[in-house]
């Protein structure tokens, strides 16, 4: 009788173990996928960035949320290697809380059914897996110049979203129309004008899958490194005040002199 009871208890315990999924001990972790290391929730489901959120607020509303549900864990428990200072929470226009990473709101993709799925990558050219080591990201937004006017991608006045390169924190990068291939024609030797158009440099690590790493190079500018894209030296615009999504530089001193950069940018001239 004792033996039968022991066997019964053992079987019961085994059944519970088989049917009860493990409880995640963290809310966010880094997981290896076919796209490299990406941010996931505690069960391994991939998290995503939306390029239209470049200003730090969510542009995904209505039916978009059915396809891209928000990741709403506030003060998430983090796996080793993640920095709590990189995470925050925003309150969406619909009142819902949404977690952010380095200012980018985080989402799931409805068609990702298994841990490590990355089916949402490059959907419509505006959704990308969330990574900790992006050197650059892409933003989609209305270009608004320092003159307060709205511009299209050809720098004529008008309303239309344009896609452009930003740093990992969503800050816009620019080219200078007078520069040559991998030659900075703007910055003075004493860097006295660097505050207005600061040169940009960062080690190239991860990039969105639509951006070709081979199109970047590093040049020397009076002893400082500067990153180039398609031969164009890259700059910030000082009056953007290091603010996400600002594009004030596109109208200075007139539209087209300091353009944003993207895949459609021509190669810099020799």
Describe the function of each predicted region.
Residues 57-88, 125-131, 181-216, 256-268:
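A low-complexity, Ser/Thr/Gly/Pro-enriched, surface-exposed linker/loop concept
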Residues 28-69:
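Post-signal-peptide N-terminal segment of Sec-exported extracytoplasmic proteins
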Residues 22-38, 141-164:
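N-terminal edge beta-strand
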Residues 39-42, 92, 98-102, 165-168, ...:
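Extracellular/periplasmic catalytic domains that process cell-envelope and extracellular macromolecules
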Residues 56, 88-139, 233-267:
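Hydrophobic, ordered structural segments
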Residues 2-30:
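Bacterial Sec-dependent N-terminal signal peptides
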Residues 39-40, 45-48, 106-107, 165, ...:
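Short, structured motif recognition centered on aromatic/hydrophobic residues
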Residues 32-33, 76-96, 113-115, 158, ...:
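A cross-kingdom feature marking solvent-exposed beta-strand/loop segments within repeated
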